[in-house]
From Swiss-Prot:
Residues 1-17 form the signal peptide. InterPro entries: Flag_FlgI (IPR001782). NCBIfam families: PRK12706.1. It is found in: Periplasm; Bacterial flagellum basal body. It holds the Pfam family FlgI. It comes from the Bacteria. This is Flagellar P-ring protein. GO terms for biological process: bacterial-type flagellum-dependent cell motility. Belongs to the FlgI family. One of its GO terms (cellular component) is outer membrane-bounded periplasmic space. Assembles around the rod to form the L-ring and probably protects the motor/basal body from shearing forces during rotation. The keyword Repressor does not apply. The basal body constitutes a major portion of the flagellar organelle and consists of four rings (L,P,S, and M) mounted on a central rod. It comes from Borreliella burgdorferi (strain ZS7).
């Protein structure tokens, strides 16, 4: 029976060394090579978000509801809102009495700074007893911040918000008309928390004289006053932990250059195909500290891939493996 193919990746030279290639025609997808890379761009392992969020709200009127609007019970309140928004002259009393308009709450959440002239989507919700706001027209509505300052103007056609259950609606045309106090703080948030990695990023940022503060195992707060600095931070190269990928089914081992195995003794029962020898031939193996790639190359002629994988997994269990062990099945049909 042919021995399964053994593949080693050495990233120092960016070459793929293959042994026993003739035994299988298995191909590995480039994504596996990339996933084992020890040097990645920050944007591949983290996202950058503004630290501040602005909440803007306002009360407005949706017109053109053709009998599906608010009842006349709240006529006085509706008139008051129309006066506050300086649109009382645009709405006749007939529209109120014929249930053609509705009193609504308009809310907008802006992550990051509110920039004059920028356009946003807002949520619209009925306040009183209107039945349906679909295809209504939101008249000009002032949106204010928590200090009561008018920051944006909302208007446009209301559409059902399919992402929300219930009676939520949206409009696409909210225009910011005032800049608020500009905030230059952002959070770098790792996709997977790791104190070692977060401290490594902190040291790199500090060496580049970028103000930063570790907030948790997954978050660093930074100060960036321009887009070019954010772009530079996104593309910073980060050295990640060494990785070892094992495909037990196909007998494949992929190891990044700096993955290492420590010193320990391992006892294994070798399966002999010779019927005249004992079927359970126990062998003791002395493993010396070295790079994992070197260990595999040194022992590939004497040990099967299955046995090598057993040793690597044993090393990981007793903390003698320097590298993150990943168990995955590689699809050999990919090109």
């Amino acid at each position: 029976m042919n021995k399964p193919m053994l593949m080693l990746i050495t990233f120092a030279t960016s070459l793929l060394a293959q042994t026993n290639k003739a035994s299988t025609g298995l191909k590995t997808d480039q994504s596996f090579n990339n996933s084992l890379s020890e040097s990645v761009k920050l944007k591949e392992i983290a996202d950058i978000y503004p630290t501040n969020t602005n909440f803007l709200t306002g009360i407005g009127i949706v017109a053109g509801l053709a009998g599906k609007g608010d009842s006349i019970k709240q006529k006085d309140l509706i008139i008051k809102i129309l006066e506050e928004n300086n649109i009382i002259n645009e709405i006749g009393s007939n529209n109120i009495e014929s249930k053609n308009i509705a009193l609504v709450n308009v809310s907008l959440q802006v992550k990051g700074n509110t920039i004059k002239g920028s356009k946003h989507k807002a949520c619209v919700a009925s306040i009183l007893d209107s039945k349906d706001l679909t295809n209504g027209i939101l008249l000009k509505t002032n949106l204010k911040n928590k200090e009561g300052e008018i920051i944006a103007i909302a208007s446009g056609i209301t559409q059902p918000n399919n992402k929300l259950k219930g009676s939520g609606y949206t409009i696409d045309s909210v225009i910011i008309n005032e800049n608020q106090n500009i905030n230059h703080s952002y959070n770098i948030i790792l996709k997977k928390g790791n104190y070692t990695l977060i401290n490594r990023i902190h040291k790199i940022l500090t060496s580049k004289k970028i103000n930063n503060k570790i907030k948790s195992d997954s978050t660093i707060e930074i100060e960036a006053k321009n887009i070019s600095l954010l772009e530079e931070i996104e593309n910073i190269k980060i050295e990640t932990n060494p990785k070892i990928l094992i495909d037990k089914k196909n007998g494949i081992i992929l190891a990044s250059e700096n993955a290492k195995i420590g010193t320990f003794t391992f006892s294994i029962e070798k399966d002999n195909q010779n019927i005249f020898l004992s079927k359970n031939n126990k062998t003791t193996i002395q493993v010396n500290s070295m790079k994992l790639n070197e260990f595999i190359l040194k022992n590939s002629n004497n040990l099967s891939n299955k046995e090598l994988i057993q040793i690597i997994q044993a090393a990981q269990k007793i903390n003698k493996l320097n590298g993150e062990l990943i168990l995955e099945e590689i699809d050999g049909n990919q090109n």
